[in-house]
Amino acid sequence: EDCLYLNIYAPAHAETGSKLPVMVWFPGGAFETGSASIFDGSALASYENVLVVTIQYRLGIFGFFNTGDEHARGNWAFMDQVAALVWVQENIEFFGGDPRCVTIFGESAGAISVSSLILSPMTKGLFHKAIMASGVAIIPYLKASDYERNDDLQTIASICDCNASDSVALLQCLRAKSSEELLSISQKTKSFTRVVDGLFFPNELLDLLAQKLFHLVPSIIGVNNHECGFLLPMKEFPEILGGSNKSLALQLIHSVLHIPVQYSYLVADEYFHNKHSLLDIRNRFLDLLGDVFFVVPGLVTAQYHTDAGAPVYFYEFQHRPQCLKDRKPPFVKADHTDEIRFVFGGAFLKGNIVMFEEATEEEKALSRKMMRYWANFARTG
């Protein structure tokens, strides 16, 4: 399947020798969904005089399947991203871009990808700045245990009528299946995520950060002020959105965050102390999720980068888009993904890709400002 491609958006005047800054976008989607084709970089490119490249990489079982040995090491999605960056280095000047001024940026799984590329020795010299929105490589629970991987291998083997005890035989069997069959299997497995493969990741990620074994490039790391306000909990545990008592919150702290029962009460005391209404407890629980998955990992990563001597900027996006007023409950603030439409100038797009309907004049001004900030960083760091 020919699934690896990239799209290039350039100002009308760009030509070989223009040496414009290059911004390479990595789409999000939990490494399960998402596509380069749903993002239109033309507004950002034309307003800010930069080249915008959106790339596709393999997802799910196609992007992360591994057998735990040399026969299928995994991290294929990251290898796709490296290949895209190599292509940019070799070809972007023919579109008016400067291969010595490449900024990688992404949101959610795309930001996790950017953060991972910073940690990999395979990407030396392939980019020069990085922007991570709502995601970094050390987000908890991205790495599956050996038990979970082996359990998923058995599940796959059973569904496909393959032999899971031998990696070579399993791979040969799976390669005989259609992409549609493998895609349906991918939706039944959860453990195929990043692995320390000795190549892309030579060591555990926190060890790489602590030992300063990563690329010291200028970076922007950011979060929204309600990362788990609606989109993510709606997918995983929608029952919480109508309100929560402390019993349900404690149950979810244990089951979702895998915090032992004896410690969950310490967390509850920190977040739910003097909170009694169902709505107050819900709001604090959603704040807790945002802190665990996005805010704290982002701050920890920023501190490691700073300690290593790399320039870091940290932001919090706080605006709830007006176009979502009837699509999300009133209590939701700036939810996960809400900033993307501003960064890409969605309000100014006129093509088939709709990113920002009914933007107010104030939102258009905010979008212009964010595009300018992102592009200025791409130009000068």
Curated annotation (Swiss-Prot):
Signal peptide: none annotated. Detected in corpus and cauda epididymal fluid. Present in seminal fluid but not found to be associated with sperm (at protein level). Not expressed in other tissues. GO terms for cellular component: extracellular region. Disulfide bonds join 162-173. Glycans are attached at residues 163, 245. The active site is at 108 (acyl-ester intermediate), 227 (charge relay system), 336 (charge relay system). GO terms for molecular function: carboxylesterase activity. Its main location: secreted. The keyword Mitochondrion does not apply. InterPro entries: AB_hydrolase_fold, CarbesteraseB, Carboxylesterase_B_AS, Carboxylesterase_B_CS, Type-B_Carboxylest/Lipase. Its EC number is 3.1.1.1. Pfam families: COesterase. PANTHER family: CARBOXYLESTERASE. This is Carboxylesterase 5A. It comes from Ovis aries.
